[in-house]
């Protein structure tokens, strides 16, 4: 099924998403990869506030190439999500509602998605140039010393993703296995 949604992504939205749905997202989301995730978890360990508003947020696992030709961002393809698996459950428990990446997730992440009524989307790997056309603005908001791995806030229009893990306990990456 094809769906169009806007951020922030809330439980009201996630409850209606099913594995295999084609979804087009419009709105603000964050971009962060493993180095930024590590720093966020270290900040939490030090009892510091996160540098982003995690409640009902969407984090796209991506490290963009430099912007060209007046575009807000360069190629913007997804990063392998397993690199964030050791950090994702804690952020989900704090209110993150959606993750975008590519590839499978660990059982711990799947459990956290279900527990927090969140969702994991996949973006098409190898389509970074095409995906970047959906990104209308991009701003580094913290950890700028990380370069391409800095946390960015982006605004997207009709950003195409596929639901991989939903709340039905069946996920597209292992369609014959029922997760309980």
Annotate the PLM regions.
Residues 1-9:
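Short, structured beta-strand/loop micro-motifs enriched in basic residues and often containing a Trp
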Residues 31-32, 36-159:
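Feature captures the catalytic cores and cofactor-binding loops of soluble hydro-lyases/lyases
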Residues 131, 171-180:
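Single conserved hydrophobic/aromatic residue that forms the stacking wall/gate
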Residues 156-169, 173:
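Long terminal accessory segments
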